[in-house]
A protein has these predicted regions:
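Residues marking the start of alpha-helices
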Residues: 17-19, 36, 104
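S-adenosyl-L-methionine-dependent methyltransferase catalytic module, highlighting the catalytic core
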Residues: 3-5, 13-15, 41-146
Length: 146
């Protein structure tokens, strides 16, 4: 959250930067996130932080928008002046906490488990049948490689 330091609170909610978590190594048995990592500028760094704070045998279970027919699409890179250089049409998702939209750095694809492996996480992708907006939701289950 803008203006809140990592580890600080806003309205009773702890705020963290997943690229630089304030938790000690091996702090958690389980970490979950729902449609977050597509908004993380350096997702590999964020995945490494998840691996760092997972206890041995711990699990990271998360969802992201995933195109199972293509490799990950990188939508933009940070330019030297701090602006975003778009490599694909920009995409934004709503942020109910801030009442605004958030840039989507990538749309994950069939190579997501390779991206997690770069960060020291062994992963598999499962598809869960749901009712509502989407009928099949990809759920990624990852474990630290230690």
């Amino acid at each position: 959250m803008d203006g809140v330091p990592p580890g600080g609170e806003l309205d009773g909610i702890r705020c963290e930067n997943v690229e630089c978590l304030t938790f000690a190594n091996e702090s958690f048995d389980l970490i979950t996130s729902t449609d977050v990592f597509e908004h993380v500028e350096d997702d590999i760094r964020g995945f490494r932080e998840i691996a760092r704070v997972l206890k041995p045998g711990g699990a990271f279970i998360f969802t992201v928008p995933l195109d199972e027919t293509s490799p990950t699409l990188i939508r933009g890179k940070r330019a030297a002046d701090g602006s975003i250089h778009h490599l694909a049409p920009p995409e934004y998702h709503g942020d109910p906490m801030r009442g605004m939209t958030v840039y989507t750095w990538r749309t994950y694809g069939i190579d997501i488990t390779d991206r997690l492996a770069q960060a020291g996480l062994a992963a598999r992708c499962e598809f869960v049948v749901t009712h509502g907006v989407a009928m099949r939701v990809p759920v990624i289950v990852a474990h630290a490689n230690r």
